[in-house]
Amino acid sequence: MSAMVQIRNVPDELLHELKARAAAQRMSLSDFLLARLAEIAEEPALDDVLDRLAALPRRDLGASAAELVDEARSE
């Protein structure tokens, strides 16, 4: 089952740009926005990314992060 979503108070400039992008892809505004929302929903949530990063094994880089940054900046 699908649902209807309404977005209020969209600035005129933003609406114009979205309509132009939809037209450039030969899509209706509704289809264009639905495709973009689907892309957003496919992106991992920040909490999931952070959990995956936390689960990675720690590596000894032989220097602190600050030292590595300083070294890279001096090159």
Swiss-Prot record:
InterPro entries: FitA-like_RHH, Ribbon_hlx_hlx. One of its GO terms (biological process) is regulation of DNA-templated transcription. SUPFAM superfamilies: Ribbon-helix-helix (SSF47598). It comes from the Bacteria. Keywords: Toxin-antitoxin system. Putative antitoxin component of a possible type II toxin-antitoxin (TA) system. The cognate toxin is VapC12. This is Putative antitoxin VapB12. It comes from Mycobacterium tuberculosis (strain ATCC 25618 / H37Rv). The lineage of its organism: Bacteria, Bacillati, Actinomycetota, Actinomycetes, Mycobacteriales. The gene is vapB12.
